[in-house]
């Protein structure tokens, strides 16, 4: 029987990180085992189940500042992070090259509406959005010299804010609108609703620049849709709503892309310090069913199915 995933309890601010303390000792023990390549411990199954429950039915967020990761050399850091991601879920491709683990760093690129680039390869501000996978996992190898704060917003609180301030927009959130596939799908664009809420499932998927860039394909957004997106942005970006953290080496963050949104402030590097995060997208067997309109985005919509990520140009062996 499929588990019901109703709208979770809303939250605001950095208090959301308090629940993560309950996982700290177990995660450090797990990282030590992965580093030493020892066989799995029987207690790890319960830890994994608890983590997924927090991500699916709780806050949708986990923050862990790992002393073990902080002390590792680069090759061991990457190996332990990769092993952790494979332990937690099923990795899905993060780009058309079929890579499953990618460094988030500034390569000097600039993302623009008519000349799209992957945001994680720029130093630009990234507005609140959700990724193309059930879960996003990030680990900091090196923080930026300046900027690069990471922000997380409760989707349930965003909707509660809209319900109180602009209830007229709520029906529009459930209507499909054009979503640019950014040259990473089988078509130019898809028609996808921002909000799906039924007695069995809850999903808020939002990445406004993908709605705006459909102009590349000769489309335009109706004035009413633009007004609705403006109202949604206002609810998302309220200063007392989001949690915020400054990355430091060894810091690990997990977010559920169906129940939270995340953002990044602009950053700058110098020769001595360059921002570098490791990023992995995961499919979770514990997650919810999605609407059929999500098929162009995630390829499968059944609860717990292997889904999400970007379909590679050529299939490569999974790591």
Please describe what each predicted stretch is.
Residues 75-82, 152-154:
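"Short basic amphipathic alpha-helical interaction patches in structured regions
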Residues 1-45, 49, 57-62, 70-71, ...:
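Active-site environment of non-heme Fe oxygenases that use a 2-His-1-carboxylate facial triad
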Residues 81-91:
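A short alpha->loop->secondary-structure connector
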Residues 93-96:
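Internal, non-catalytic "lid/hinge" segments that mediate substrate recognition, gating
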Residues 66:
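Short glycine-centered, acidic/aromatic-flanked micro-motifs in structured strand/loop junctions
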């Amino acid at each position: 029987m499929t588990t019901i995933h109703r709208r979770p309890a809303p939250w605001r601010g950095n208090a959301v990180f308090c629940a993560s303390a309950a996982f700290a000792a177990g995660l450090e023990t797990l990282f030590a085992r992965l580093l030493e390549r020892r066989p799995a411990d029987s207690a790890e199954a319960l830890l994994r189940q608890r983590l997924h429950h927090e991500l699916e039915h709780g806050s949708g967020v986990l923050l862990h500042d790992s002393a073990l990761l902080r002390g590792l050399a680069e090759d061991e850091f990457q190996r332990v992070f990769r092993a952790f991601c494979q332990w937690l879920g099923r990795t899905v491709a993060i780009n058309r090259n079929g890579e499953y683990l990618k460094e988030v760093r500034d390569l000097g690129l600039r993302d623009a509406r008519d000349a799209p680039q992957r945001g994680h390869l720029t130093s630009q501000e990234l507005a609140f959005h959700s990724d193309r996978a059930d879960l996003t996992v990030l680990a900091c190898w090196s923080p930026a010299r300046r900027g690069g704060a990471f922000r997380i917003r409760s989707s349930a609180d965003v909707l509660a804010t809209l319900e109180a301030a602009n209830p007229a927009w709520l029906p529009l959130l459930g209507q499909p609108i054009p979503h640019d596939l950014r040259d990473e799908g089988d078509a130019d664009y898809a028609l996808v609703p921002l909000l799906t809420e039924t007695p069995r499932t809850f999903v808020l998927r939002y990445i406004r620049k993908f709605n705006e860039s459909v102009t590349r394909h000769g489309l335009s957004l109706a004035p009413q849709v633009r007004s609705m997106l403006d109202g949604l942005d206002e609810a998302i970006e309220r200063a007392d709503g989001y949690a915020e953290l400054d990355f430091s080496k060894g810091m690990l963050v997990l977010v559920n892309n169906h129940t939270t949104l995340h953002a990044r402030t602009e950053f700058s590097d110098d020769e001595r310090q360059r921002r570098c995060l490791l990023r992995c997208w995961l499919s979770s067997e514990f997650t919810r069913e999605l609407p059929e309109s999500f098929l162009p985005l995630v390829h499968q919509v059944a609860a717990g199915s292997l889904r999400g990520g970007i379909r590679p140009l050529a299939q490569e062996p999974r790591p």
